[in-house]
């Protein structure tokens, strides 16, 4: 466990405070993630050359390739991060990439899924013969192609609480205890 805080939000602040990107890349991604991967390799008794698909979402260009090189993973095994089509989906991003890989994976393939954010996680999967029976109802590619692009900037600002808006009487947060509910559950 490494206490590495790359961004934070002070109580009462509307936005996160991010540290310098170069520091996050060099001290975070390029030191912490390879350590997590190599620790996993030690525990599972495999090495980077055995990885068929390497998943590591990153907003930094080429960082995925640099991590692969540090861990002995063939750079051709790095999975594209889909950033140009879906942006940065946050904590769901590595799972979105995993779903995309599982749609084309073959039996016996090793899939390394990593994430970074205030530390790092590394998980190793190996597909079985059952992967041949996996037929998704919708592929990730089809979902992206059929997606609806949101071009209403005011809606974006509202959904991300970047503008104040009137929510109406029902939208107000009630911080009082509902006395009727409290009474009903008193025994």
Annotated model-derived regions:
Residues 65-97:
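Conserved catalytic cysteine-centered active-site region
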Residues 85-121:
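Repeat-solenoid scaffold signature
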Residues 54-66:
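Glycine-rich phosphate-binding loops at beta-strand->alpha-helix junctions
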Residues 1-27, 31, 113-117, 122-183:
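Condensing-enzyme catalytic core mediating Claisen C-C bond formation in acyl metabolism
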Residues 14-35, 84-92, 96, 100:
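Active-site pocket-shaping loop/turn-to-helix segments
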Residues 186-187:
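Cysteine-centered iron-sulfur cluster-binding motifs in ferredoxin-type domains/subunits
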Residues 49-56, 76-82, 109-116:
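Beta-strand segments within the central parallel beta-sheet cores of soluble alpha/beta enzyme folds
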Residues 34-52, 71-74, 104-105:
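Phosphate/pyrophosphate-binding loops at sites that engage ATP/ADP/AMP, CoA/4′-phosphopantetheine
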């Amino acid at each position: 466990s490494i206490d590495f805080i790359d961004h934070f939000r002070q109580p009462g602040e509307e936005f996160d405070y991010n540290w310098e990107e170069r520091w996050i890349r060099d001290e975070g991604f390029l030191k912490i993630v390879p350590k997590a991967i190599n620790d996993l390799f030690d525990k599972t008794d495999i090495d980077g050359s055995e990885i068929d698909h390497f998943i590591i979402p990153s907003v930094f260009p080429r960082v995925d390739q640099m991590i692969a090189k540090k861990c002995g993973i063939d750079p051709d095994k790095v999975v594209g991060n889909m950033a140009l089509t879906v942006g940065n989906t946050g904590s769901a991003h590595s799972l979105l990439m995993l779903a995309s890989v599982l749609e084309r994976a073959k039996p016996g393939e090793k899939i390394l899924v990593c994430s970074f954010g205030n530390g790092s996680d590394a998980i190793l999967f190996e597909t079985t013969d059952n992967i041949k029976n996996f037929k998704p109802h919708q592929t990730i590619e089809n979902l992206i192609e059929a997606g609806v692009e949101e071009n209403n900037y005011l809606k974006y600002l509202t959904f991300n609480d970047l503008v104040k808006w009137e929510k109406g009487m029902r939208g107000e947060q009630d911080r009082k205890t509902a006395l009727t509910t409290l009474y009903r559950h008193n025994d």
